[in-house]
């Protein structure tokens, strides 16, 4: 144990930079990222990359249509090939480009052969995970041409995990394997693939859609870096999705608990497990924009003063409900306890849940991406095998902030806005950090915009009144502007 600690201490000055697919979508983006790495990193730092642009989606479509529509599959195949080759040709010198094209075409031939096999976990993961390999190899070659000593590394060489709905990294095995590469390339920037790991059989394991952030924090925790910066196409974390809400504003500081809850609620800006690997460490986490590095950022702070204030409105239009309706003779509390133990053991907690003791009903809300896999796992529990079903076409809208559920003003405003919406149920977190509504619709854009407008205007007045310390003025504003919500 002491040896491991000593090894980690040697790498404490290291930083890790993670770049998402939107930061690597075209030639200009790759050059921009190379400049950021040159300016913001030093020898020995780690760079984790996602697949370029929409490569992962293209690979999924290629695989999908290879079995049902060969003409369409051929179009996806050609699109992937030309996109990757175009990046290589335009970013590298002729000699280096020819070499990387050979590597790419060798990979591509391998994937074409795999498409002739039955599609199982092994084949699917091997094909879909290749975007990260191409991205890391190319990024490392670009850095070399920038005069930056670099080495690309396939994360499957050291990250170990087994197939499941939420693959968990074997930290002990992974740390031991990673150590030799850190020693070997201690004076280089290591460009590492995100999203992929390997199991004991040597098969590729995917760490979940948008799992590169999770890869980054996991690798950062394994190496004991002192700071992780996640770069994307937005400046940081906003009060709402800035692509949906024009008035959303940047949050320069967010508490660890608030960020963790945002991730748990499957917000697009944070992968659901991004914060897990670093929750018990002192690693700093920051979010910045690769398109405009100096515009601003969001820092995740371990301790922030609690003020029962709203920070974020988040939504997800692709969630499902797993429903378990027990028979009259079944002991509801006993079954519910067994389900909870199962979910805890497998770390597959729902986004929200509803328990109706009278109707012996349990509803568990998950993203569409993982719902089918979790339902399959739950159906293995013998006592609920015949009682379980899946309903889709739901959405989730939530407000997040430390102690938000104890602030009656925000709660009432939230409930009032949802009074005419098809609400399936409301739920709030145990720590009172989020209030959630699950809706039987998948169109929440207008609702989110209106909620943001009202809640953050209310926040503005709330802060103004506290500054003035005038209760009369405060309640006057509430009565005149928000009489509907009180």
Cite the ranges covered by each PLM segment.
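Nucleotide/pyrophosphate-binding catalytic subdomain
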Residues: 1-270, 275, 367, 438-440
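A conserved active-site cap/scaffold subdomain adjacent to cofactor or substrate pockets
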Residues: 256-301, 306-328
């Amino acid at each position: 144990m002491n040896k491991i600690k000593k090894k980690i201490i040697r790498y404490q000055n290291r930083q890790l930079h993670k770049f998402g697919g939107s930061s690597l979508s075209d030639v200009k983006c790759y050059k921009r990222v190379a400049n950021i790495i040159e300016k913001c990193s030093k020898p020995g730092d780690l760079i984790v990359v996602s697949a370029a642009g929409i490569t992962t989606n293209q690979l999924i479509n290629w695989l999908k249509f290879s079995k049902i529509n060969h003409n369409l599959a051929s179009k996806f195949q050609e699109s992937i090939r030309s996109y990757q080759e175009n990046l290589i040709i335009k970013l590298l010198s002729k000699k280096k480009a020819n070499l990387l094209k050979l590597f790419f075409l060798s990979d591509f031939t391998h994937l074409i052969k795999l498409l002739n096999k039955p599609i199982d976990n092994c084949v699917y993961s091997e094909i879909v995970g290749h975007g990260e390999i191409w991205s890391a190899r190319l990024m490392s070659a670009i850095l070399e041409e920038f005069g930056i000593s670099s080495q690309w590394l396939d994360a499957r060489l050291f990250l170990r995990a087994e197939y499941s709905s939420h693959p968990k990294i074997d930290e002990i095995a992974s740390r031991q394997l990673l150590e030799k590469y850190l020693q070997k390339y201690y004076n280089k920037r290591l460009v590492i693939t995100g999203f992929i790991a390997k199991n004991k059989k040597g098969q590729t394991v995917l760490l979940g859609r948008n799992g590169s952030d999770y890869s980054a924090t996991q690798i950062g925790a394994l190496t004991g870096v002192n700071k992780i910066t996640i770069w994307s196409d937005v400046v940081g974390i906003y009060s709402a999705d800035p692509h949906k809400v024009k008035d959303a504003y940047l949050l320069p500081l967010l508490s660890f608990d608030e960020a963790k809850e945002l991730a748990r609620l499957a917000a697009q800006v944070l992968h659901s497990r991004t914060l897990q690997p670093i929750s018990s460490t002192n690693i700093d986490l920051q979010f910045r924009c690769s398109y405009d590095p100096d515009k601003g950022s969001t820092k995740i702070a371990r301790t922030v003063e609690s003020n029962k204030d709203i920070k974020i409105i988040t939504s997800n239009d692709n969630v499902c409900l797993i429903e378990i309706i027990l028979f009259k003779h079944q002991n509801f509390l006993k079954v519910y306890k067994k389900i909870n133990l199962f979910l805890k053991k497998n770390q597959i907690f729902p986004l929200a849940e509803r328990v109706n003791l009278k109707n012996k009903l349990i509803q568990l809300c998950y993203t569409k991406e993982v719902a089918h896999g979790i339902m399959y796992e739950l159906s293995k529990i013998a006592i609920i095998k015949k009682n379980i079903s899946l309903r889709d076409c739901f959405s989730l809208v939530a407000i997040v902030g430390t102690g938000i559920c104890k602030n009656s003003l925000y709660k009432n405003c939230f409930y009032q806005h949802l009074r005419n919406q098809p609400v399936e149920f409301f739920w709030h977190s145990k720590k009172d950090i989020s209030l959630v509504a699950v809706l039987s619709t998948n169109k929440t854009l207008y609702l989110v915009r209106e909620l943001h407008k009202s809640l953050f205007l209310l926040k503005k007045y709330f802060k103004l009144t506290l500054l003035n310390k005038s209760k009369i003025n405060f309640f006057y504003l509430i009565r005149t502007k928000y009489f509907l919500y009180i």
